[in-house]
Amino acid sequence: MDSVLELVRKERRKNQIKREIEDNDRKIRDNRKRVELLLNLKEYLKVNMSYEEIIDIIENMQSDYEDRVDDYIIKNAELGKERREISKTIKDFKKSVS
């Protein structure tokens, strides 16, 4: 009994570690993107620019990023639909085999 419980604990810990690693990878990726964004912004901004020009650049960048977010949302929806279809196919296959 103890060995089964220990096995379950180890599996749960392994899954927890996997989720933590994935979370840290996302944080690393997000922070790298922020650094890249700031570097890009520094390239666009010039000393003699007006406030309005700077705001225009920022608004254009914001619009580009919002478009990307929308694209990713659509892609995730498509992937989710495909995953559900595959799950249904697997479930139906298992029923037919049993």
Swiss-Prot record:
Residues 7-34 form a coiled coil. Disulfide bonds: none annotated. GO terms for cellular component: cytosol. Its main location: cytoplasm. It is found in: Cytoplasm. Pfam families: DUF496. It comes from the Bacteria. Keywords: Coiled coil, Cytoplasm. PANTHER family: UPF0265 PROTEIN YEEX. Pole-localizer protein involved in the regulation of several cellular processes. Belongs to the pole-localizer TmaR family. HAMAP family: Pole_loc_TmaR (MF_00683). This is Pole-localizer protein TmaR. It comes from Fusobacterium nucleatum subsp. nucleatum (strain ATCC 25586 / DSM 15643 / BCRC 10681 / CIP 101130 / JCM 8532 / KCTC 2640 / LMG 13131 / VPI 4355). The gene is tmaR.
